[in-house]
Amino acid sequence: MKVWIVEDINDETVVAQTATVAYNICRKSILENEDDDEAAGEFLNELAHSYSDSRASFGVEGVIWARAMDVISE
């Protein structure tokens, strides 16, 4: 996965865009692993940590988990 860093946008935009990408990835992973909650959970954990380690980590981990919980509850 490529992470594009854009210098001239604000932190909120980065978080929103990152959360949207994460939401779509989480949704795909959960649907593919719907019979395996542990695998889906591990994927979400790795995804959240990879984003929180990136330069655009302004609260992103929490946003990813919140969006993931939305997917799971659908």
Language model regions located:
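Conserved aromatic
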Residues: A16-T20, E34
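Short, mixed-charge low-complexity intrinsically disordered segments
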Residues: D11, K28-E74
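Short aromatic-glycine-(Arg/Gly/Cys) micro-motifs in beta-strand/loop hairpins
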Residues: M1-E12
